[in-house]
């Protein structure tokens, strides 16, 4: 029997689900292969979505027609907007999610997406013919043929879990690892290595003394990750709880370090710098007497809690003893211990910006296989890989995002141009155009691109136009409406603001950092009437978007001009068959890096570590500039 598809997606994690859903929505016949259909989009670590820079990625995924934002909104049990005390370029949405409902919501999407089919199995190897992928062969011996394959294998390629001295093969607790794909691709010349990540114990909430913790509730107004107006039932909101380790806890952990895989030589791989294990914390920060932890609820009604900040691969008995040294956890019962896991990843400089591999045509990688960490980073890559897998099948060009267009663009460019030597996670500091990549306007930046390829439906387009019309109407009004001191000063003085000495435009008044649009509405009835025309469910979002554009107009224009200047280098393409090793005028390091990465444009070459401005000038001469 022959089974033929346009796109095969291997793995149904966050990257795989976005890839499969996007390709299917665009019209490809898609097969999603997973060893467990009951664990689609499993939240393998903490039950949360978003956070600093990650929340922006989720909004970008939604603006492009992806599903992570919609699923998060439907399953959120707490919402917070982080960094509100800073400028809007730093605002980052974050939500606690009901883990089980999150998987159920994704399963519902996958099952009801036309053109998307599932197969429960694992993949043994790829079918590759004449340098191009042709399908996969599963552990059951079934061969599926396809014009493109997207690998989103997470931590399952060669996965080995560490529970103290005990080592168990697996990609997740109680789930087997995959073998065969890494070995096959290595034989084809792919560069591969190992990385490590970890997860903490899960705790029974009935054994926690919450009176000895600090409650952290969410925000009362129910924000959304999605720009869509999809109806939803708001789940019962749950709090998180803060607590701290102490010297007694640290002493117990220290005595067990000789049994820690991280310190006895058992683990050789590099773990995530910004999510260190508790063992790493007490060694690296030996002078600190306490480290903050957070108890995060796993669901709307669940007693299970995730202990954020206590990732560990120490033996169970040491983990348990150390936890019981914390007053709130004196009588703790755990559902399962923390553990570390090592897995295979592939050097992402072997990818193009479409996430297609350079050595094998039609083969795409997304997620942890590229050396990243995080649900959001994986989902963003999956979406781009799924779009491009579809376009590749139908000879319809390619879809990429620039560093000035999306955090997803920054993420992929960093991977492709710089590579990774540790698990990569996104931060706002990685983006040079943060003011252009705000979470409030991802729809303005990206939904037109989704419309152009057919990924945005008509309702999404309607909502974008509505937002644009009302936002521009508000801004236009502020440019035209003049304020007289005798009318506005009583309001300003009663609110503690400096009075006006002469008449000014409303726009100029709003440039004052301490004065907001909502406050001005109470002073200017005609502005209030425009605000009241906006649908109530979107009023706060649209007013906020207009206010940000007014207050940060100068900064936005300056950053846009800088981005446009750099983008001119993006249009200068490098010849792909030049022998850089023969270009003696380039530095030795530049020759090596350019040969290995083979950048597509001058701009990409300029971002490669080791390629100097002098090297870039030589490349410009090569391109006839």
From Swiss-Prot:
GO CC: one term?
A: cytosol
Q: Which domain of life is it from?
A: Bacteria
Cofactor dependence is on: FAD
The record's subcellular locations are: Cytoplasm
Protein name, please? tRNA uridine 5-carboxymethylaminomethyl modification enzyme MnmG
Give a GO molecular function annotation for the protein.
flavin adenine dinucleotide binding
Report the Pfam families cross-referenced here: GIDA, GIDA_C_1st, SAM_GIDA_C
Binding of FAD: at which residues?
11-16
Q: Extract the Gene3D superfamilies matched here.
A: FAD/NAD(P)-binding domain, GidA associated domain, C-terminal subdomain, tRNA uridine 5-carboxymethylaminomethyl modification enzyme MnmG/GidA
The text of the family note is: Belongs to the MnmG family.
Q: Which UniProt keywords apply?
A: Cytoplasm, FAD, Flavoprotein, NAD, tRNA processing
UniProt: NAD(+) binding residues? 271-285
Free-text function comment from the UniProt entry: NAD-binding protein involved in the addition of a carboxymethylaminomethyl (cmnm) group at the wobble position (U34) of certain tRNAs, forming tRNA-cmnm(5)s(2)U34.
Q: How does it assemble?
A: Homodimer. Heterotetramer of two MnmE and two MnmG subunits.
Identify the coding gene: mnmG
